[in-house]
């Protein structure tokens, strides 16, 4: 009897464990994964991927009066992290964030326009605007992306609308390409015999975002259309599995026209960049932006509203003026942004005048030029160089880009060693505007370099990669040295042990005699010191792979890149 008691005592708990639980608990392969216990170390939600810690008040509160025309000054450039994490993406020298000391000079570069511009023109009846000869076939933000799943370039653009226009507004069309330069307009079924994919709205700006991190295939394409109903502009959020057939979801609160949306994947939030015309007095109106963010694009759209309490930024104090209308104060007409490598790239359409009534009387096109800015927190923008990134052509009478240049969502695309930027431009045919799409190209990472003969020492860094890469153009030679936190050379990684680099390469591996890898230095704190003789460096990064993938974001994508939108091994 005693033996039976002990036998039952042993087997009963085992049977309860094996058989117990709710009847509806899945079994086999459907069992939910084991949840690891929470870490003893609390997660700091304000700590970003690069070591920047966001302020407690987020988003920051800014004044729409005292800061209206002062642009922005990122806090993290004057209050740097004690250690900068460079594990994500190529590290660009667009500001002084990475630099502790240097005697090299920062040089900015600008994309070159493709000689065959424009690459997309209005040729169809549904691309005409009105009946007097105006026509429109260009993104108004909209989007140009490379879809790695299909191996195809894709463009969404605004067309004049022709007979499909609502209250004179445009429609949304789709085009595709195999090389990013030559485009076709496929005949689709949404509107029989056309390439229209969205209409029946009084549209203004729109954004089509190819969300490469989206797990729900039916929402891989997201549209944030700005359209007017009953006199009010609102975001109209739509989703699609293919970018052609769209399902309407929700609308926002009232906003203004020329508002945009983009994803900041570094923080996994959707940013609502809302135009706000701030009335200063009876004679002065300043075009500025309001800010909203939300991790859920549907909830974010529903809450989005243009309010001065959400003021973000207006023009910088040193914006360039229109040479023919020098007394007009410049303003921010639009802002788009794209995640590229380790930063957010911002594109600012800076309005330089004149107002529409003056344009009509003087028979000119209002001047918007596209400027570029950089952000490491997704909110604070740095614009040291105030020259146009995409400039109007004032010397050729029939140039496609005479005026009103606008940036495009998704740009740039990474095509080999180059970046492809798409933009819209306008010209006059008599008194009618013709709006077309252009292309500009830049060296990969080629926004700015540290140039000359001299040295550059970084701030204290940490990383989890193994292979050191640079994007550089060096006529003499470049060597790299690694230092500990006390500025002492790390054994095996001295300047003398570094194999000198010479040449022009957007992805060159740096090695040391006896040390082809930095694996032994993972997660240790160190500084990098560059010695450059007659050359320039655009970027550096430490890759987990000998192939040089950066683990950064790839903006609008490109041939051969990972479908995730991250530069990692396929």
Protein language model regions, located:
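Carbohydrate-active catalytic/glycan-binding domains of CAZyme proteins
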Residues: 31-570
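General helical structural elements
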Residues: 6-7, 26
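Bacterial N-terminal signal peptides
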Residues: 7-15
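Positively charged n-region of N-terminal signal peptides that target proteins for export
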Residues: 1-4
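Bacterial Sec-dependent N-terminal signal peptides
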Residues: 15-39
